[in-house]
Regions:
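Secreted, luminal/periplasmic, and some membrane-associated catalytic domains
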Residues: 19, 26, 64-65, 89-103, ...
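His/Asp/Glu-rich, glycine-adjacent segments
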Residues: 74-211, 287, 293, 299, ...
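Short, solvent-exposed loop/turn segments at secondary-structure boundaries
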Residues: 35-38, 211-215, 251-253, 392-394
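Glycine-/proline-rich flexible loop or hinge segments
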Residues: 28-32, 51-57, 65-69, 87-100, ...
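Short, structured active-site-proximal loop/turn typified by the sulfatase FGly-forming signature C/S-X-P-X-R
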Residues: 35-76, 123
Length: 410
């Protein structure tokens, strides 16, 4: 792409890339994972970027889930603008609960689509296919998932024969290799085609199972570091962030530490008079059992909200509770896609519907999950230093990463 021009997307202006830009979103990467891997000598590239590049912490979007944060990263704005408020929501107009994976729910363009329209070569690779259609909306470029790499076609994905790129089989969706496949395919395309912009989004399989410092987690971060080093040495401007963090959410006996909202609320408003929505819900329940730290409640009678809020505010394990408009203003969310009440749990607690609504038999380890303010802090790393005289923002968001990679690095 010819250096020099700029594009303006969703009110933000970006320089078109002069060097290849690679942005990696490490799903579920609590900052302590990098700290532990560096301390164990497993992440020398990240240690190098901390010394000679730029490294700090940033806030992700709350609810701290995959879809809202990935879409914020590629649009540069909050869910109040782009409209993707969770992985799952209640469509009041259609009176149905739906996955928020369809591009019809996206309310603005992505930076990736605009750059491609202006002539940039753009590559998007996701681990899970659930994100692919959202991230690739309006994109003239390459966009595929490692989950369904064998099914990629030029017509739909901008590329075929993806499996020829990587000397490993297409991984199981519940595996660390699903993320490695993203990076391996990304590096192969980077070396072969040197696209102007790449967005590589991983999966949090490891983070749901292994805490920071665990040998398995350190091994995973060593693998990531290998690819970060390769992109850096290949001349890329590399930006690394996460969609959310991750915390332990279990009791001492290993069982999930859950506040079940449906029986609690229905004891006040009556059976069938409240609909609890858990925006963490997605097809990958082995990770979390659809238990996260953010919930929204639709009430048959909106004037019940004040007493429901008062009751929940006094409930152990609940950190914050708001009426819908107040919660949406607090977290920059689209008010028409949240309920009458918004609930956020404490760091070590998750929110559920009712016990019978969650099949926890698939959880093989003590629950680690996300969704709340306690999982909002994420890494924000660039392999290059900021331009001399550039001051870092005092309240960085993970969705500032493209701004920094395109506009602010030396």
């Amino acid at each position: 792409m010819t250096p020099g021009p700029t594009v303006t997307v969703n009110g933000r202006t970006y320089r078109c890339p002069r060097d290849p830009v690679v942005i990696v979103c490490i799903d579920g990467s609590e900052p302590a994972y990098f700290d532990a891997a560096i301390a164990a000598g497993r992440s020398p590239a990240i240690a190098r970027f901390r010394r000679s590049g730029f490294a700090t912490l940033a806030r992700s979007v709350v609810p701290s889930f995959t879809n809202p944060n990935n879409l914020s990263i590629v649009t540069g704005v909050s869910p109040a603008v782009h409209g993707i408020a969770g992985n799952y929501f209640y469509d009041a107009a259609g009176a149905r609960e739906v996955m928020m994976n369809d591009p019809q729910f996206l309310r603005c363009e992505t930076l990736l689509a605009v750059l491609a329209r202006e002539g940039a070569g753009v590559v998007v690779i996701t681990a899970k296919d659930k994100l692919r259609r959202l991230l690739g909306h309006g994109l003239r470029g390459v966009c595929f998932s490692s989950e369904k790499a064998a099914e990629a076609t030029k017509e739909e994905h901008g590329i075929d024969r993806v499996t020829d790129l990587v000397a490993m089989p297409v991984p199981d969706v519940y595996s660390a290799e699903l993320s490695e496949y993203v990076l391996a395919a990304g590096l192969a395309l980077f070396e072969r085609e040197r696209p102007d912009v790449m967005y590589l989004s991983l999966t949090d399989y490891i983070q749901h199972k292994h805490p920071p410092g665990d040998p398995v987690a350190n091994e995973f971060y060593a693998m990531l570091d290998h690819y970060f080093d390769a992109f850096d040495r290949g001349g890329a401007i590399l930006g690394i962030t996460a969609d959310h963090g991750m915390n332990a959410k279990s009791r001492a006996d290993g069982t999930p530490n859950v506040v079940y909202l449906t029986p609690l609320v229905e004891s006040m408003v009556g059976s069938g008079q409240a609909r609890v929505i858990l925006p963490i819900t997605d097809p990958y329940v082995v990770h979390h059992g659809a238990l996260g730290s953010f919930a929204t409640i639709h009430l048959s009678r909106a004037d019940d909200a004040s007493r429901v809020i008062a009751r929940l505010a006094a409930t152990p394990g609940v950190a914050e509770v708001y009426d819908g408009p107040t919660g949406c203003a607090r977290f920059e969310l689209p008010a028409d896609r949240l309920g009458d009440v918004i609930v956020v749990s404490e760091r070590d607690v998750v929110l559920g519907k009712a016990p019978e609504a969650h099949d926890l038999s698939l959880l093989r380890e003590p629950l680690r999950s996300h969704g709340g303010v306690s999982e909002q802090t994420v890494p924000f790393v660039l392999n290059r230093a900021l331009v001399s005289g550039t001051r870092a923002g005092t309240d960085l968001r993970n969705f500032d990463i493209f701004d920094y990679a395109l506009n602010r690095v030396a």
